[in-house]
Amino acid sequence: MKSTTFLALFLLSAIISHLPSSTADDDLVDAEGNLVENGGTYYLLPHIWAHGGGIETAKTGNEPCPLTVVRSPNEVSKGEPIRISSQFLSLFIPRGSLVALGFANPPSCAASPWWTVVDSPQGPAVKLSQQKLPEKDILVFKFEKVSHSNIHVYKLLYCQHDEEDVKCDQYIGIHRDRNGNRRLVVTEENPLELVLLKAKSETASSH
């Protein structure tokens, strides 16, 4: 009984500590100024108009269905709703934590909705997998606030796990392939700069 009470108090304190009464500069905040919900669904949009639309999937190469993560060429498209999840038990994404990103409505041939990074002719690229993945292969992203922006704009870091540490020293950017697909790839230059727009619940149904 005591252990149950202690656990309940611990969870309550964790929830209260992440209530959105105020935000700090390093909090992960959406386009409307609200803290980003852990497990919530959002559109990842360019903060500068005319740089393309939101993030979606495309079928490339010999893929049986759209497994390549790309930016929509349609500037008025929000793309697909994306779930943002942390490994921590909290209502909101903890500051500076690694996150998993996954499509709320993934394609049928994907074994998992979560993004991962795989080798490709264009270099390491963001894809969906046809196989189940371990946690270390999906908790590989981190949002970094753009310091020169006075609004909530973020770069997306790619993080690699080794035996003792996690290294986050590369970014996610865009590579346009010969078919015009704006693929998300790992890069050290010209990272994506994104704003997070909360998706409506009826649009972002979970599979």
Curated annotation (Swiss-Prot):
PROSITE patterns for the chain: SOYBEAN_KUNITZ
Keyword Disulfide bond: yes
Keyword list, A-Z: Disulfide bond, Protease inhibitor, Serine protease inhibitor, Signal
GO molecular function: serine-type endopeptidase inhibitor activity
General function of this protein: Inhibits alpha-chymotrypsin at the molar ratio of 1:2 in state of 1:1.
Pfam family, one: Kunitz_legume
Keyword Signal applies: yes
Top-rank taxon: Eukaryota
Membrane spanning stretches: none
Membership in a protein family: Belongs to the protease inhibitor I3 (leguminous Kunitz-type inhibitor) family.
Family matches, as InterPro entries: Kunitz_inhibitor_STI-like_sf, Prot_inh_Kunz-lg
Protein name as catalogued: Chymotrypsin inhibitor 3
